[in-house]
């Protein structure tokens, strides 16, 4: 199927028999360049994952039945900022990539106990090459899936705010 370009620069498609994309469904765009088909992740994807078998990257349809339950409406950052800079994947003792949930459970309480008022999370956007330290970004609107789901990151932010800690995303 070919995308149709609209007057406003947006491309769209209607596929007969397909009424909606399903939650969890993976997708990508196939671009033809110099006669070759190239798989591309849409620039505005908000959740991107890597296939464990063939290591390809795809966008994922990711919408929740109910909105995320933010609990930080009353949060206001402190006037004095004392920043704890961290990398979620490296902030643990085990020899594996850490997760948002592990950070929330194991590191965040120590950050609060030490009196930090802000958490600067490094390399948060999706990037395919882990050794790049997260600075070869491929998807600016997607948090790195190797650390967990978007809801896991939101839960970490809620927990930080509950402890009086502001969150900065690098």
Map each language-model feature to its residues:
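Hydrophobic faces of well-ordered beta-strands that scaffold small-molecule active sites
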Residues: 82-86, 119-121, 167-169
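Beta-strand-rich binding/interaction modules
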Residues: 1-2
């Amino acid at each position: 199927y070919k995308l149709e370009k609209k007057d406003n620069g947006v491309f769209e498609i209607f596929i007969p028999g397909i009424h909606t994309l399903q939650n969890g469904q993976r997708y990508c765009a196939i671009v033809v360049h110099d006669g070759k088909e190239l798989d591309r992740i849409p620039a505005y994807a908000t959740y991107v994952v890597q296939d464990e078998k063939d290591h390809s990257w795809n966008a994922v349809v990711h919408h929740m039945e109910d909105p995320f339950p933010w609990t930080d409406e009353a949060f206001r950052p402190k006037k004095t900022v004392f920043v704890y800079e961290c990398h979620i994947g490296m902030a643990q003792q085990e020899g594996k990539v850490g997760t948002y949930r592990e950070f929330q459970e194991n590191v965040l309480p120590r950050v609060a106990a030490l009196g930090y008022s802000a958490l600067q999370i490094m390399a948060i956007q999706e990037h395919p090459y882990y050794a790049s330290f997260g600075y070869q970004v491929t998807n600016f609107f997607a948090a790195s899936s190797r650390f967990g789901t978007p809801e896991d990151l939101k839960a970490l932010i809620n927990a930080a705010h509950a402890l009086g800690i502001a969150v900065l995303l690098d």
